[in-house]
C-alpha cells in the first residue's frame, strides 16, 4: 500500500501543515546563501554582475566575462530561531487546556556549502562551468512532549543542486548562457500519535523520502555601454516526486487494525518554484 501527499515549495512551504521554517524571499523555503560574494552585496545586480564563477547560478551568460579557469567556494552557517507561542489552546473534545510546553526553539544551526568552477575553451570563445549548491532546505525540531507533537516533532528538507552550464558571446555586446540542474531532494517528517484514549503512551510516525529530477536555467547579458550591463535570467521549476516510507513505532495493535497504522510505502510531490530576474550593473 502506498500513501501519496502533494506538497509545494511556493507561497509558504508547508509552514502550517508541517511546521517547517526558513529564511523567505518570496518563494517560501528558498535559501539565499548561494554565493559568498553575492551575500556581501545583498545580491544587487546578481543577473548582470558576473564577477566570479557563482554567476553560473544567477546567470550563466556571465561566465563569458571570466578569463582562464576560476574557482570559488563558500560555507554559510545559519542559526535559525523558530518559537511557538500558545494563547490558551484547548482539547476540542474535552475542552481542557492542552498544556504549556511550547516546544522551545525549534530552529538550529545549519551549514550551507556552495562550489563553482568556470573554464574557457575554444580559443577563449566559450565557457564551461559547474556549480554545486543547496537552494532549498532547513527544518525544525521541537522539545519532547511539546503541545503540538501530534502535528510535528521534527521536519527536515535538504537539497543538492548540480548545475553544469555553457556560455558564449553571440556578439561583442551580447552573451548567452544555458545550464541544467540535476537536483536531489531528501525530506524527513516526524510526529507523535495520541493513544491516551487507550491508556497508552504516545506512538510515533516517521515519513522519509528522496528523489532526483532535472531542471534548467538560462540567461543573456547585453553590454549597452562600456562597463554597463543589462542581464536577464530564468530558472525553471522542478517537479519532484519523492519515494519513501512511512514507519510507525509503539502503535497499539488495535490502532494498527482500525486506523491502518502499519509501515508502508509513501510518495510526495514537491514542486520548487521558477524564478525570473533582471538586473543592471
State the predicted function of each range:
Residues 1-10:
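Bacterial N-terminal signal peptides that target proteins for export
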Residues 62-63, 77-81:
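Short active-site-proximal "capping" loops at secondary-structure junctions
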Residues 47, 51-61:
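Periplasmic N-terminal accessory/gating domains of Gram-negative outer-membrane beta-barrel systems
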Residues 25-42, 46, 84, 91-102, ...:
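Outer-membrane beta-barrel porins/channels
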Residues 43-46, 70-79, 102:
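Short strand-turn segments of transmembrane beta-barrel domains in outer membranes
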Residues 15-24:
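C-terminal segment of classical bacterial N-terminal signal peptides
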Amino acid at each position: 500500500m502506498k500513501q501519496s501527499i502533494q506538497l509545494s515549495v511556493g507561497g509558504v512551504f508547508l509552514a502550517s501543515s508541517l511546521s517547517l521554517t526558513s529564511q523567505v524571499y518570496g518563494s517560501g523555503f528558498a535559501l539565499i546563501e548561494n554565493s559568498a560574494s553575492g551575500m556581501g552585496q545583498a545580491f544587487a545586480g546578481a543577473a548582470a554582475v558576473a564577477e566570479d564563477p557563482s554567476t553560473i547560478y544567477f546567470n550563466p551568460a556571465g561566465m563569458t566575462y571570466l578569463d582562464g579557469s576560476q574557482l570559488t567556494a563558500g560555507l554559510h552557517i545559519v542559526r535559525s530561531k523558530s518559537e511557538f507561542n500558545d494563547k490558551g489552546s484547548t482539547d476540542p473534545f474535552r475542552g481542557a487546556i492542552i498544556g504549556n510546553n511550547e516546544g522551545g526553539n525549534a530552529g538550529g544551526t545549519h551549514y550551507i556549502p556552495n562550489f563553482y568552477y568556470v573554464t574557457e575553451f575554444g580559443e577563449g570563445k566559450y565557457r564551461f562551468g559547474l556549480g554545486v549548491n543547496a537552494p532549498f532546505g532547513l527544518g525544525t525540531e521541537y522539545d519532547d512532549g511539546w503541545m503540538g507533537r501530534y502535528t510535528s516533532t521534527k521536519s527536515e528538507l535538504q537539497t543538492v543542486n548540480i548545475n553544469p552550464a555553457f556560455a558564449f558571446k553571440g556578439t561583442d555586446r551580447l552573451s548567452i548562457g544555458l545550464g541544467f540542474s540535476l537536483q536531489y531532494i531528501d525530506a524527513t517528517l516526524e510526529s507523535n500519535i495520541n493513544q491516551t484514549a487507550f491508556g497508552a503512551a504516545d506512538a510515533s510516525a516517521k515519513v522519509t523520502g528522496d528523489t532526483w529530477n532535472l531542471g534548467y536555467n538560462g540567461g543573456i547579458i547585453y553590454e549597452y555601454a562600456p562597463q554597463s550591463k543589462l542581464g536577464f535570467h530564468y530558472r525553471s521549476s522542478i517537479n519532484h516526486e519523492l519515494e519513501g516510507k512511512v514507519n510507525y513505532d509503539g502503535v497499539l495493535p488495535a490502532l494498527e487494525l482500525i486506523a491502518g497504522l502499519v509501515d508502508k510505502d509513501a510518495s510526495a510531490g514537491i514542486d520548487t518554484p521558477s524564478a525570473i530576474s533582471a538586473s543592471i550593473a
